[in-house]
Amino acid sequence: MSRQPKLERFNNLVKSKYQVYNSLFMTLPFHGITDTGVLLPLFDRICTRGYDKHYNPEKIVNYFFDKYQRDVSEEERYDLLFRFIQYIERQVVLFDAIEDAAYRTVNNMDGRGTLRNIKEEAEAQSKTEELKAYLQDFKIRPVLTAHPTQFYPGAVLGIINDLSKAINENNVEMIKKLLSQLGKTPFFKKEKPTPYDEAVSLIWYLENVFYKASSHIYNYVRQNVFKGEAFDNEVIDLGFWPGGDRDGNPFVTTEITLKVAARLRNTIIKNYYRDIRSLRRRITFVGTEEPLADLEKRLYESIFLPGDEVTVSLEELETTLLRIRKIVVERHESLFLEEIDDILNKVKMFGYHFAVLDIRQDSRVHMHVMEEIVKQCAKDNLGIFPDNYLELSEEEQIKVLQDVKGSVDPSTLQDDIARKTLESIYAMQDIQKQNGERSCNRY
């Protein structure tokens, strides 16, 4: 049987399933769901026709109520419109879950542009060495940016994940329960999310999507392109803005930046802990049990015990895994070696930082900040800058800054923006001490 075109696969596996499960969603015994599901297509049709005729929104909405809901009060009108929004939000989630479940079938995962295709083309054209040379320098940086309107709350993300799994397994009973959960789960909190809340929501993607996907790509390159040869390039370098993006966001404070960095470190250690636990089920050989158990214990302590200090350094984690790897190769026929290599590759890619926390600030702010710092240094007689620094030309100021040495206490600065900007510089140093140099090295 020939493979269906992509559009047909999409229609069969996404569109048709959406129609079936949306019908199931309409039958759930919740207040107003059935009425909302019946009236929404009518409202959609009237909106489309009204838009084509260049009617304004008020005229379109009034026409709908005059035709289908003539006797309802104004409060009931608002209630129905609000239920339309709630219903559509959940339809979008349902569609996302179905699309995620069908992604590997709808899309050709080995087709043109994929890693496998590039590798095979290079081999066919005898250009494998050129591909290796290119990959030694090639790097991408997916950056998760801070846009609170563009992501779901954690509870909804969990439902999408579980719903996709249930759809893949055709588990109708579980799908029905998850749709019921979806109908009862609020999508928005009454309070506006803080920058830290935004960061936590995006860290969910790092923990549940990028962690596995990035390592899968990296493992493929090491195993199938380099095949045991030296390969020191991480290929994927994740970036992260929430908690560090001060450009236009007055709510991002130094405390939040430090808190987000700690959350990133805690999350990656948690992922390592899970992997080590899974590894212990496979690496059960003489000489490996004790060091693995010790790693698991100390990673657990680093996650759950109070305090910011980790009980196992990144270097120690990597060294211990390499020692275990050597034992498995030399004494145990390299059994489950790929699982050890998988964790080692993750440690190389993510360190203790997970993603690079970018500190961002409007460049125009820095002129003002420098002026405030120079004035405060003069007031405190620190002797860091020449007395006439502010009168110097830009070129002369640059020469001074190249040789300037000294330390300024941010708390002495009277200007709020200047103080917070300088605090963010010191915060970068603290983050690098805790999470490693790669954790926060871009301003």
Locate each region found by the language model.
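Often metal-dependent polyanion-binding catalytic scaffolds in large enzymes
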Residues: M1-K399, Q414-K420, S439-R442
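C-terminal amphipathic alpha-helical interaction region
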Residues: V408-D430, N435-Y443
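Extended, compositionally biased accessory segments flanking or bridging domains
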Residues: D403-V404
